[in-house]
Amino acid sequence: MTIRPLHDRVVVKRLEAEEKTASGIVLPGAAAEKPDMGEVIAVGAGKIGKDGARRPLDVKVGDKIIFGKYSGQTVKADGEELLVMREEDIFGIVEK
């Protein structure tokens, strides 16, 4: 199943969380926090402004992003957990 987001929404796959703390303690799955970084896997066509013009999104497929811990709606597609969120919930793009 493929999810095609509408308007200013993006579909994000969370990046794997670290399973060890900085001091080397291994965290069990339930104790590890969900990561607040992910990779954009699909983008909508853009938000329609008051003038009727469509504004394209600043993020694109493949971008690594940072978002709020409670951002977006969790959905499952083909057994994979994904997030659907608005572009405004994205704090920034991680550049190398």
UniProtKB/Swiss-Prot annotation:
Main localisation: cytoplasm
GO cellular component terms?
cytoplasm
PROSITE patterns per record: CHAPERONINS_CPN10
Domain of life (superkingdom): Bacteria
Q: Where is the signal peptide?
A: none
Q: Which UniProt keywords apply?
A: Chaperone, Cytoplasm
Give the UniProt subcellular location, in the record's own words: Cytoplasm
The GO annotation for biological process reads: chaperone cofactor-dependent protein refolding
For this chain, one GO molecular function annotation is: protein folding chaperone
SUPFAM superfamilies linked to this entry = GroES-like
Mention any Pfam family matching this sequence.
Answer: Cpn10
Matching entries from Gene3D superfamilies are given as: GroES chaperonin (2.30.33.40)
Q: Which HAMAP family does UniProt cross-reference here?
A: CH10
What this chain does, per the entry, is described as: Together with the chaperonin GroEL, plays an essential role in assisting protein folding. The GroEL-GroES system forms a nano-cage that allows encapsulation of the non-native substrate proteins and provides a physical environment optimized to promote and accelerate protein folding. GroES binds to the apical surface of the GroEL ring, thereby capping the opening of the GroEL channel.
What the record says about family reads: Belongs to the GroES chaperonin family.
Protein name per UniProt:
Co-chaperonin GroES
Provenance organism: Neisseria meningitidis serogroup A / serotype 4A (strain DSM 15465 / Z2491)
Gene that this polypeptide is encoded by? groES
